[in-house]
Regions:
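Mature, soluble, non-transmembrane domains
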Residues: 44, 58-143
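N-terminal secretory signal peptides
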Residues: 1-53, 57
Length: 143
């Protein structure tokens, strides 16, 4: 949380690995997926947005990505747009801000509704990575 406290979620991402933030748009009441990645220096990028219809606050940014149709979804793919560290105000249960990573789903709305959280990344040494493979951070989801 931005206001302090223990992290809600710790993901040991490898460079290029992706995680998804999934939620229900509060105005359109439609599902949204935002796919993010991490580069070797620890910068966060948004790679793709997927939704049923353009809604309030959604849509293509000129020169960023490519709009395609994938089944029932509008998808902006190949974005690779740097977000860096960012703050998300977690929505209520029903909005269900959920982080999807390596087959796990962590519903942040169930843990901390209406709380501002910071998504941030820091490169770690191979030794730290090896240590956390044996002894995962308490906020890392079990796979």
């Amino acid at each position: 949380p931005v206001q302090g406290g223990a992290p809600l979620l710790v993901l040991p991402l490898s460079p290029g690995e992706r995680f998804t933030i999934h939620y229900t748009h509060s105005v359109e009441n439609a599902p949204i997926w935002e796919v993010h990645s991490l580069d070797p220096s620890g910068r966060i990028f948004i790679e793709e947005e997927r939704y049923v219809t353009f809604g309030a606050g959604m849509g293509k940014m000129p020169g960023v990505g490519r709009l395609v149709r994938r089944g029932p979804y509008e998808v902006i793919e190949d974005m690779h747009w740097p977000t860096g560290n960012f703050i998300l105000r977690i929505g209520s249960p029903g909005v269900d801000h959920t982080v999807i990573w390596r087959g796990t789903r962590t519903n942040l709305s169930a843990r901390a509704p209406h709380v501002a959280v910071q998504f941030s990344a820091t490169p770690v040494s191979w030794l730290h990575r090896a240590w956390r493979q044996v002894f995962p951070h308490p906020a890392t989801p079990s796979q």
